[in-house]
């Protein structure tokens, strides 16, 4: 089949999940990836990828997510998306030119809306679906926010024909056609040999905004080396080693870390659990991250803290519980990749059209340009 694979471009976790399943899908199907932002930077190096706009959070000077800046920065894109502006119409044409028969989307609104408008069946494959398409499992302090975000996500994305959710923790689907699998682990993670080294690994998904003076002071006061990814800084300062993005080097540092301090993304939580690395989660203010951090603490595989108010005493308390966290992780290690591939294959077969649409081929030069162009940004 000719399949579009849409990937949300905010952060790298969506791209890592896609990267783990794309090679097997491409053995059986003709795949075009549609992604923007961080995901485009990762995936375009390995797969045929069309760049699309990104709707993402914006930050204020204090490093917090800013509602006003987020609305202002995304207003033009959202208007284009919902009102079938230039970028939305171009994306529809891209789908027609490639004869797209099916969409798999990892939290990407652009490809979801395009497939809906063109009557193309959809498979949602992400983590955030656990909020929208599973029965509520939110702690009391997050209940109202969870119900709000679940309703909002369903209103924006609709109800895809099939839903596959990858998560480091279990939940109960709301309806048939929804299935859960474990974390989607990369080959590099499965091949890694974990050892308990001396260093702590710090990862911030938007560290250029999140790395603050309080966190810097706390990390410098620790009596151990700290390897830091995601800030944009480079070089060694005291016990801090600021490192550039690198898949293999990051995984080597993860496998040999004593423990992890990170924002509360699902992908890293699954990888850290598989490798037996306790997690001190410092979530963004977004509900999904706050829920993940709460679950990490509830499962006993780490603890949560406020990023802007992290103190050495918090880290010391966390480090004092590492043995218990590691023990709890042994029963939660899982790799959902094989099950995800099997489920995707079954979903694709169930949604396969009885007759294929006639493909509207674009001129070869136009196709080459489409693979590298950025969809015009109306913001």
Give the residues covered by each predicted segment.
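A short, glycine/small-residue-rich beta-strand->loop->alpha-helix junction that serves as a flexible
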Residues: 6-19
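Conserved nucleotide-sugar phosphate-binding/catalytic loop shared by glycosyltransferases and other
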Residues: 8-9, 32-82
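Conserved nucleotide-sugar donor-binding subdomain of glycosyltransferases
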Residues: 68-102, 109-110
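A donor-sugar binding/catalytic signature common to diverse glycosyltransferases
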Residues: 102-107, 247, 252-292
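A nucleotide-sugar donor-handling region in carbohydrate enzymes
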Residues: 134, 139-209, 230-232
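Donor-nucleotide binding loops and adjacent catalytic segments primarily
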Residues: 184-259
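Catalytic binding pocket for nucleotide-activated donors in carbohydrate/polymer assembly enzymes
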Residues: 268-269, 273-325
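C-terminal amphipathic helix plus adjacent low-complexity
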Residues: 317-379
């Amino acid at each position: 089949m000719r399949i579009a694979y849409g990937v949300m471009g905010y952060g790298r976790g969506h791209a890592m999940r896609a990267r783990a399943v794309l090679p097997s899908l491409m053995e059986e199907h003709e795949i075009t990836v549609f992604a923007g932002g961080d995901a485009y930077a990762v995936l375009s190096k390995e797969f045929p990828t069309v760049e699309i706009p990104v709707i993402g959070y914006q930050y204020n000077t204090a490093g917090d997510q800013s509602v006003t800046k987020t609305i202002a920065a995304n207003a033009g894109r959202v208007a284009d998306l919902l009102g079938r502006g230039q970028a939305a119409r171009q994306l529809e044409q891209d789908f027609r030119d490639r004869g797209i028969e099916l969409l798999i989307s990892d939290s990407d609104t652009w490809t979801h809306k395009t497939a809906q408008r063109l009557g193309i069946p959809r498979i949602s494959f992400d983590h955030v679906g656990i909020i929208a398409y599973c029965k509520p499992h939110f702690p009391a302090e997050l209940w109202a926010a969870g119900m709000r975000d679940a309703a909002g996500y369903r209103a924006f994305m609709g109800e895809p024909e099939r839903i596959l959710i990858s998560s480091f923790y279990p939940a109960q689907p709301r309806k048939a056609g929804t299935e859960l699998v474990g974390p989607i682990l990369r080959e590099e993670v499965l091949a890694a040999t974990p050892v308990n080294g001396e260093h702590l690994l710090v990862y911030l998904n938007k560290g250029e905004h999140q790395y603050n003076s309080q966190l810097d002071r706390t990390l410098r006061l620790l009596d151990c080396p700290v390897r830091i990814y995601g800030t944009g800084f480079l070089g060694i300062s005291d016990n801090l080693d600021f490192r550039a993005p690198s898949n293999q080097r990051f995984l080597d540092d993860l496998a040999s870390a004593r423990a992890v301090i990170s924002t509360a993304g699902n992908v890293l939580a699954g990888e850290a659990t598989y490798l037996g690395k306790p997690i001190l989660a410092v979530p963004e203010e977004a509900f999904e991250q706050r829920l993940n951090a709460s679950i990490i603490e509830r499962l006993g595989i780490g603890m949560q803290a406020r990023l802007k108010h992290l103190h050495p005493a918090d880290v010391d308390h966390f480090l004092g519980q590492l043995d218990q966290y590691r023990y709890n992780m042994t029963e939660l290690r899982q790799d959902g990749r094989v099950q995800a591939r099997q489920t995707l294959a079954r979903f694709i077969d169930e949604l396969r059209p009885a007759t294929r649409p006639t493909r509207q081929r674009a001129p070869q030069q136009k196709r080459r340009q489409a693979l590298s162009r950025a969809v015009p940004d109306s913001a």
